[in-house]
Amino acid sequence: VSAGITTGALGLWPLRSFAASAGTYTVRKGDTLSGIAKQFGTSVQSLRYENGINGDLIRVGDVLQLPGGGGDMLTEVRRVSEPKRGGLRTWRYIVAHHSGVDTGNAEIYGNYHRNKVGMRNGLAYHFVIGNGSKSGDGEIEIGPRWDRQLNGGHVKSAEVNNHGVGICLVGNFQNGRPSPRQIAALTSLSGYLRELIPNRTKYAVHKEIDGRNHTVCPGRYFPTSQMHEKFPDEW
């Protein structure tokens, strides 16, 4: 795991996430949240978030919103970000990472960063994009560093941590490829951030910032060249 791996209780700052609704499901006798999550390829956490459920209690006849389907992946990102127009930190970079492990979500990584790595602000990244393991496939989770417009902790470079938005895709892309929904979410999020941030931004992956001798992040199977084609340097 790289400066790219995190986990954690995010302290006073709640995570926000959004996976576009795939429709609804009516609870039947014998259903459990974990069973419904498995059936629809999402997570219990995502079902709780979408439906405002605090525990595991569901009742026959309840109509649940299902995360992870088609639609606008950026609804919650826009809702959180639009009020910040004119008051954004001076961002100059957008940096893509992989988590380096097969499962996880922003809460897990935030706990690790806070409690094991000792990061006072928790989650090192500004956004985490799920792979269907502990959050929805393509689900964009908004970390407290974006919500509060705080510097990142995702690379060695102080300059890039101070002025770089860190986006982590859950998975180890040395061993396999990100899912199509993860790439769709990353592309949508990166495009929106470039439009939102008033000054010019440089698109990069972790190893391009800290050097290949330091990290392989985001892995050999991450589509680095394709992402650069979509987001050519503006410097």
Locations of regions flagged by a protein language model:
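Extracellular LysM carbohydrate-binding repeats and other cell-envelope/extracellular binding modules
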Residues: 21-29, 35-75
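Second-shell loop/turn segments in exported
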Residues: 32-36, 93-101, 171-180
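N-terminal post-signal-peptidase region of extra-cytosolic proteins
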Residues: 45-52, 78-79, 107-114
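Basic/polar, cationic surfaces and motifs that engage anionic cell-wall
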Residues: 70-90, 131-134, 139-142, 146, ...
